[in-house]
Amino acid sequence: MIGFADRLAEITKKIKGASIIDEDFVKEVVRDVQRALLEADVDVKLVLELSKRIEKRALEEEPPAGVPKRDYLLRIVYEELVELLGGEKTEGLDIDLSRDVNVIMLVGLYGMGKTTTAAKLARYLQRKGYRVGLVGADPYRPAAGEQLRQLAEEVDVPVHVEDVDDAVEMAVKGVEALKDECDVVIVDTAGRDRLSEDLIDELREMAERIEPHEVLLVLDATVGQKAGDHAEAFHEAVQLTGVVITKLDTAAKGGGALSAVARTGAPIKFVGTGERVDDLEEFNPRSFVARLLGIGDIDELLRRTEEMLEEEEKAEDVLEGEFTLKDLYEQLEALSKMGPVDKLLQYVPGMGGGRNVRKISQITEERLKKYKVIMDSMTEKELENPEILNKSRIRRIAIGSGTSERDVIELLNHYRMMKDVIEDIQSGRIPRIGGELGRVIRNVLRG
């Protein structure tokens, strides 16, 4: 949420740096919050109500013993923003996957990101151990089936796109084709430019035939507070079980979309935070607001790290043998699966979603990409035996990778540093606490 995150991070910085918390300062903070929310297209009435609550609480409530006034003011801002985005109503919501075969139906208008969301949701559930399949049910958009097939190949799940002109039949036959090999079948339905009667009839008939356990509306965050109207209309038409909001990373109106949907009572279950198939998060207002304010979300950071460690089984194997550049390459591959560095830094307290994250992550992302390009220019023998890399080989690798000899030497220095860490762990000089790969990652990020 470009702009919005920066604004909120600045508010946090202002509160933390304040020496006196008096009525004038509280009103100044309230005005800053108002400005941030209005620029994010949050409904004016909601903004005014939230402003009054923040001001009233900040001036009337006494902080608990030992808690500085500035910390308590930040807590009030945090709690009220969480409430604005759904509060406890959307806390810890899971999708219903209690049956042997669970059907998830994605609905929405054209251009909202349904097909991409289908693949992202497949990847998300796949990582949780489910066998997922995708079904195309859009006979109107010529490239829809091919797009879904390509995405299914990317996330490595089966896909079925029936060659008929009827959307309902495509859904029915697709679910039937995949039900024996999948725990979860995600149906990517057709959209329209608006919620017309024919779309409503089509979705209702489809729902009657395939009996979905979840009906998720996919909404683009760029529509802002209009998202609430869309959610209400679709809910009336097909009884939604939840909402997925896409493009939240780039939408200036993301705050408006989130708050408008939360106001309808339709649970926001997932948010899309980037273009990669890994960029889908279960929506939790508390951790989401914590990251926007720059106070971190350690639980999410740990979850992502653990997920990567579980996925990369070779990490433990590294400790049993010689650590080579090939091992380093595989660990950088594993690191890239955690998502872009700026996403990871958002979970770290004090980083937030502002400019500081983008500055640091840009340097780190460039370094990791450069390292991979350099190693792609090495032979298998060089990756397995880095000690043979003499001056002439380094020069050849630099030319082949379009980098400098200095860049290649920098990579080799990082490799030797990591190798020393691995050897210390192998010898027992460093205990295996916190994960050896985590230490490698920290060394890479430290640069």
Swiss-Prot record:
Task: Give the location in the cell.
Answer: Cytoplasm
- Where on this chain does GTP bind? 108-115, 188-192, 246-249
What GO MF terms are annotated? 7S RNA binding; ATP hydrolysis activity; GTP binding; GTPase activity
**Which Gene Ontology cellular component annotation is one that this UniProt entry carries?**
signal recognition particle
List the PROSITE patterns.
SRP54
Mainly localized where? Answer: cytoplasm
- One Pfam entry for this protein is SRP_SPB
Question: Which keywords belong to this entry?
Answer: Cytoplasm, GTP-binding, Hydrolase, Nucleotide-binding, Ribonucleoprotein, RNA-binding, Signal recognition particle
EC number annotated for this UniProt entry? 3.6.5.4
The protein's enzyme class: hydrolase
Q: What Gene3D superfamilies does this protein map onto?
A: P-loop containing nucleotide triphosphate hydrolases, Signal recognition particle SRP54, nucleotide-binding domain, Signal recognition particle, SRP54 subunit, M-domain
Q: Please list the reactions this protein catalyses.
A: GTP + H2O = GDP + phosphate + H(+)
GO BP: SRP-dependent cotranslational protein targeting to membrane
Q: Which family does it belong to?
A: Belongs to the GTP-binding SRP family. SRP54 subfamily.
Tell me, in a sentence or two, what this protein's role is: Involved in targeting and insertion of nascent membrane proteins into the cytoplasmic membrane. Binds to the hydrophobic signal sequence of the ribosome-nascent chain (RNC) as it emerges from the ribosomes. The SRP-RNC complex is then targeted to the cytoplasmic membrane where it interacts with the SRP receptor FtsY.
The Swiss-Prot or TrEMBL note on domains reads: Composed of three domains: the N-terminal N domain, which is responsible for interactions with the ribosome, the central G domain, which binds GTP, and the C-terminal M domain, which binds the RNA and the signal sequence of the RNC.
Q: How does it assemble?
A: Part of the signal recognition particle protein translocation system, which is composed of SRP and FtsY. Archaeal SRP consists of a 7S RNA molecule of 300 nucleotides and two protein subunits: SRP54 and SRP19.
Write the protein's name. Answer: Signal recognition particle 54 kDa protein
Q: Which gene encodes it?
A: srp54
